[in-house]
């Protein structure tokens, strides 16, 4: 298959007018590399195995071709997108809704931790696009609520995370339930052996696309470190919030208890702050994320796990309140800022016991850090 050269604008891709209108209203001007490469492959009906990092526009890369092919007259599932987390299910479903604004198809997010009833009713109405987590999808199949016999495409989004989280058996069961004659697309941040084996087993003559991580993840983020005693970290954070012109700030802590403790302290100091972690109900997390997404919150405090899949373009600053455990966690955290062509600042607190670990982290991360002196120590 001969691939077209990268498109400079969406107008250079062949996209249905209804979808072109929606993406123009969303402000999408130039397609990302993964969109340029993946959209023509999927439009041609080919299977796809794409290596692309989070934040590269991969959701639109598969949503656009799917929305073009879905038949809104047929009241049954035609496209299935399997994702590792509830937050990602909701995010992908929202993007389908936004891009498909002028199409007449319907999408539904299927995930655990909430009652079955609303999902059952949505499926009964004949939704065409189903986005969900493996366990709850299988539950609905077993209950007779979800029929996959009419699918023309299956997408495994963040396939490496699906396997890392132990969903391999459920994913295989789902794929065996799907029609043999179907299109299959896998998107993964890494080309680990397990993901490649899955792709080879359940796809046919797949086109392989590898997208290099965007340089903006490094170049557009200023890395700052601050030496601070553990007992002074709250005051240090307040000083940084005053010093920088911050839009929205994402603060990382290791533990749920640490998240709650910091939220309470900042709230008492009259900061517009909220927390998100795994002990909160799904509804509480969704409400908090929506407030942050809409700009109603200035500071969001989160654990690493709770912030996975968090994609908000206006996060101006990330603060590593607790030193990241390793370079991978560091990269994930700081990558929440400096997105969509914007610049960002990542501040890492280095406590009195953190110097050796920070030196190792800095060496592995391979990015320059600037030291900032706090006023509370510069007196």
Which role does the model predict for each range below?
Residues 2-379:
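Conserved helicase RecA-like core
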């Amino acid at each position: 298959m001969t691939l077209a050269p990268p498109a400079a604008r969406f107008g250079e891709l062949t996209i249905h007018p209804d979808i072109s209108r929606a993406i123009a209203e969303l402000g999408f001007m130039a397609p990302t590399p993964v969109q340029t490469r993946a959209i023509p492959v999927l439009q041609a009906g080919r299977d796809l195995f794409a290596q692309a990092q989070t934040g590269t526009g991969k959701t639109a890369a598969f949503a656009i071709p799917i929305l073009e092919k879905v038949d809104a007259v047929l009241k049954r599932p035609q496209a299935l997108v399997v994702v590792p987390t509830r937050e990602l299910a909701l995010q992908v479903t929202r993007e389908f809704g936004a891009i498909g604004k002028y199409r007449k198809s319907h999408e539904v997010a299927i995930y655990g931790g909430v009652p079955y009833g609303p999902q059952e009713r949505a499926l009964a109405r004949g939704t065409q696009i189903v986005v969900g987590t493996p366990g709850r999808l299988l539950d609905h199949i077993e209950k007779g609520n979800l029929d996959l016999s009419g699918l023309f495409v299956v997408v495994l989004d963040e396939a490496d995370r699906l396997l890392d989280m132990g969903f391999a058996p459920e994913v295989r069961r789902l794929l065996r339930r799907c029609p043999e004659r179907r299109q299959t697309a896998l998107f993964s941040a890494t080309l680990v052996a397990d993901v490649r084996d899955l792709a080879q087993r359940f796809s046919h003559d797949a086109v392989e696309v590898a997208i290099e991580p965007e340089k903006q993840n490094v170049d557009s983020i200023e890395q700052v470190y601050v030496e601070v005693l553990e007992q002074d970290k709250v005051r240090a954070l307040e000083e940084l919030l005053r010093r920088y012109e911050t839009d929205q700030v994402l603060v990382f802590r290791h533990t749920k208890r640490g998240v709650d403790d910091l939220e309470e302290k900042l709230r008492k100091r009259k900061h517009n702050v909220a927390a998100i972690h795994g002990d909160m109900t799904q509804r509480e997390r969704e409400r908090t994320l929506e407030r942050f997404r809409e700009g109603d919150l200035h500071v969001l405090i989160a654990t690493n796990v709770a912030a996975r899949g968090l994609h908000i373009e206006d996060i101006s600053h990330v603060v590593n309140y607790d030193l990241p455990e390793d370079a991978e966690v560091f990269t994930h955290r700081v990558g929440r800022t400096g997105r969509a062509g914007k610049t960002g600042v990542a501040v890492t607190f280095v406590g009195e016991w953190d110097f050796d670990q920070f030196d190792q982290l800095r060496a592995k991360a391979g990015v320059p850090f600037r030291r900032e002196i706090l006023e509370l120590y510069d007196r």
